[in-house]
Design a protein with these regions (language model features):
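Metal-centered catalytic cores of metalloenzymes
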Residues: 1-52, 56-136
Length: 136
């Protein structure tokens, strides 16, 4: 059975809540061999989007980045609705997970200890955030 995860992105989820019209979701599907994590990010009403990253940390606390999903670009791009897709492998892991197998990231996600953060030029600390949860 495939492992799937979902993340709902909202400004209210930031450690210091952000009042924004922006929103989004991120969906993840782990490959059957566990070596690749496919993702699909959809963001809405983001002005000057610069990057999207997975971080290690529980809800309500900031933690270190573990993988880039988009960017870092400068200047940022403004979009009404945008979709980014890609794959993460162990080679893409950074920070505390650099050099480790992808299974370490999956362990953090499964434990509720990973989140997606969306950054913009206007909210350099993060405009949207959401914990990554297993789809049951």
């Amino acid at each position: 059975m495939l492992k799937q995860f979902l993340c709902r992105l909202k400004g209210d989820n930031e450690v210091s809540p952000v009042h924004t019209r922006a929103s989004g979701t991120t969906e993840f599907v782990l490959s059957s061999n566990g070596n690749k994590l496919h993702y699909r990010i959809q963001v809405n009403n983001v002005r000057k989007l610069t990057q999207v990253r997975i971080h290690i940390g529980p809800a309500g606390k900031n933690g270190p980045a573990a993988a880039y999903l988009f960017g870092n670009i400068n200047p940022g791009i403004s979009i009404n609705t945008g979709i980014v897709t890609g794959n993460i492998t162990s080679k893409d892991l950074i920070g505390p997970l650099q050099g480790m197998p992808l299974s370490k990231l999956i362990e953090e996600i499964s434990a509720g200890n990973a989140y997606v953060n969306v950054y913009s030029e206007f909210c350099t600390g993060g405009e949207l955030r959401g914990q990554i949860d297993p789809i049951k």
